[in-house]
């Protein structure tokens, strides 16, 4: 379900009336934000709402709004490594990604499991460049939790969300994606 949701993030952003024309490279949904699953058959609006209604935006509407940030290729590799190394022990940290693929060896040392990581735009494999900025979409809660990576790793790992110009983001509410003046 998380993979479908991350694909839906990309679709929602790139098909919004206020789309800025900058394609989404990666969309991320941590499993801890997915609240329900679906049984085979028809799916109701209520079921969709229940599966993903965590939080509330500044606009008072249930569900965290989407944010747009930029991470370097090196930071995306770090995110893949965190997913491969930590998510078996902390299942709420499992990342479901659209646009980011990686291969890992579960028998390798923690934080050294990923053997290959790259972008996949649906038509081709794109190698990550360590210093290049890539557009990442996630929900507000996930963005706010990124500082936990640095804290929990005692500074060994770092993911610093940035604006398109590389300036670190101080307030994630400044990067909420909107459509017609409403949070997306």
Describe each region flagged by the PLM:
Residues 1-161:
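Solvent-exposed loop/linker segments at secondary-structure transitions
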Residues 160-184:
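Long, compositionally biased interface segments
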């Amino acid at each position: 379900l998380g993979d479908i949701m991350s694909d839906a993030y990309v679709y929602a952003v790139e098909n919004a009336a206020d789309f800025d024309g900058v394609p989404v490279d990666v969309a991320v949904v941590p499993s801890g934000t997915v609240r329900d699953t679906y049984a085979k058959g028809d799916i109701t609006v209520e079921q969709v709402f229940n599966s993903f209604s965590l939080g509330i935006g500044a606009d008072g509407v249930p569900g965290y709004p989407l944010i747009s940030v930029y991470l370097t290729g090196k930071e995306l590799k770090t995110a893949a490594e965190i997913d491969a190394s930590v998510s078996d022990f902390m299942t709420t940290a499992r990342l479901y990604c659209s646009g980011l693929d990686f291969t890992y060896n579960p028998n390798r040392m923690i934080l050294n499991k990923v053997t290959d990581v790259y972008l996949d735009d649906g038509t081709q494999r794109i190698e990550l460049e360590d210093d290049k900025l890539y557009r990442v979409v996630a929900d507000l809660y996930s963005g706010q939790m990124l500082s936990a990576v640095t804290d929990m790793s005692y500074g060994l790992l770092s993911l610093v969300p940035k604006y398109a110009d590389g300036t670190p983001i101080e307030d994630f509410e400044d990067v909420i994606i909107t459509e017609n003046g409403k949070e997306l």
